[in-house]
């Protein structure tokens, strides 16, 4: 099984280009099922979850053509949904990726029927699908859960309705939003997720002919249309990848510019990096972080839905706090079981105490390289970051988690001066 070996001690310097957002491209690819003509998606990242989604679309009968493109242009995909003949998302594909549930709304709205296996993915808590089911039921769907499958049908077109989410759910908002686009009448979604990836999905749907207002706010209003046509959409840059590289620069005392970024989607993260002592400069599509010659200061944070601090950056900031000056307190309010990286960071010499959903991190003068194991996507990134500042070699096992959400991370870090390699 492949591993990544990081030799610590190098400050990162240079420029890195950010890939398309994992959490935007997956729902957007699923949204192509709503159209009755080919849809081109550009700035598509090379990720294992994207490959899985393409396999799922192909399993349903869609034709997917991939253009690898260039570094400047990025990768693009042309999805032709006109050949879709199946409305069942099988366990074999869904078990590896929770985002597979995002075909439920589009298939139901377009074909009046859908069967999707209960999802898998990272083992970081229950992440219930009830928000998806309740929202689609509000639009008139008949839904049951049998033999590990969510089975949904509708009698004719779905009907627009007002639905209030019990809790903020990003994928729940996306699934119900996609279904509402082809529903009859007006749908109002209250307590909707405000994440930039939801807004990007809405922008894609609008480009195909949908009528949506309020994406990026807690209240989204959808005027249903009878059909979506073809079109083109470029996926927004990945704010979590952006944040990960900025934290890497801050931890190593370096200076890095991230290009093809969207600074306005990262306010909470940039605020914490500034609090840690970094000097940050932004343009419309780039962020420069300068931490040369300085040790970061510990920061305390609480994860919460956007625009607050993102749970997907929690592990990276825990790694930063491991070598920062002072004590940082991290409260995780989104997912249970999202401190699984703590035991691995302890192996490197970190000083972390966990009390329920809170982790108290006391900065150490130094970490020491050791064999560690990735437990989920963002945990794997935190172990790489810790390895960048640890003495000696850190060997990270089970890096297949990493490939679900980071495109060519070892090449990108290597170009910034890190000593990092993938081994068979």
Curated annotation (Swiss-Prot):
Record keywords: Cell cycle, Cell division, Cell shape, Cell wall biogenesis/degradation, Cytoplasm, Peptidoglycan synthesis, Pyruvate, Transferase
One GO BP annotation is:
peptidoglycan biosynthetic process
- Reactions mediated catalytically: phosphoenolpyruvate + UDP-N-acetyl-alpha-D-glucosamine = UDP-N-acetyl-3-O-(1-carboxyvinyl)-alpha-D-glucosamine + phosphate
Which positions does UniProt annotate for UDP-N-acetyl-alpha-D-glucosamine binding? Answer: 98, 127-131, 312, 334
Where in or outside the cell is it found?
Cytoplasm
Q: Name one Pfam family in it.
A: EPSP_synthase
The record's InterPro entries line, in alphabetical order, gives:
Enolpyruvate_Tfrase_dom, Enolpyruvate_Tfrase_sf, MurA_subfamily, RNA3'P_cycl/enolpyr_Trfase_a/b, UDP_GlcNAc_COvinyl_MurA
The protein's job, in short, is: Cell wall formation. Adds enolpyruvyl to UDP-N-acetylglucosamine.
UniProt lists the family membership as follows: Belongs to the EPSP synthase family. MurA subfamily.
Q: What is this protein called?
A: UDP-N-acetylglucosamine 1-carboxyvinyltransferase
- Organism, by scientific name, is Xanthomonas axonopodis pv. citri (strain 306)
